[in-house]
Amino acid sequence: MTTDTHTAVTTQVYRVYIKATPQAIWDAITKPEWNERYGYPGRSEFDLRPGGAFRAIAGPQAQAMGMPELLVEGEVVEADPPRRLVQTWHPLWDEEIAAESPTRVTWDIEEDDGGVTRLTVTHELENAPVTAAQVTSTA
């Protein structure tokens, strides 16, 4: 008998409202000098054209804890600055998760009233149960 301990989560959607312009949000996501301030200890690099590379690089703290230098790799599927970014996301921090198929992350940036911008992040996790379990903190 086999027991599957991985969750069935296939899509995560996060929506947040930020008092900033769409361009400022775009820059915070896509420019390494900005995203290293807000993300995990490290930086993300994007080649913002369809087929361009995405890389999340571990900072010194993460590497000191045993993480590899290249944490996540992927490909830019669509880039429409400063409105929409679609990318694949393939974590590499352990063998089990690296063996799974890449997932897909969509960043939708929409200007709202009063100088506020709505950021919606959709992470499609189909066919990646280990990734789903880890990113939903259920592993």
Predicted features, each with a name:
Residues 54-56, 84-88, 119-121:
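Short hydrophobic/aromatic-rich beta-strand segments that constitute the beta-sheet cores
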Residues 13-14, 32-71:
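Short beta-edge strand/loop motif at the mouth of beta-sheet-based domains
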Residues 94-138:
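Beta-strand/loop substructures that line and gate deep hydrophobic ligand-binding cavities in soluble
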Residues 16, 72-78, 103-111:
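Hydrophobic/aromatic beta-strand elements that line small-molecule binding cavities or substrate pockets
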Residues 10-18:
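Short amphipathic
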Residues 80-85, 114:
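Short, conserved beta-turn/loop elements at beta-strand boundaries and strand-helix junctions
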Residues 1-11:
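Short acidic N-proximal helix/loop "leader" segments that mark the beginning
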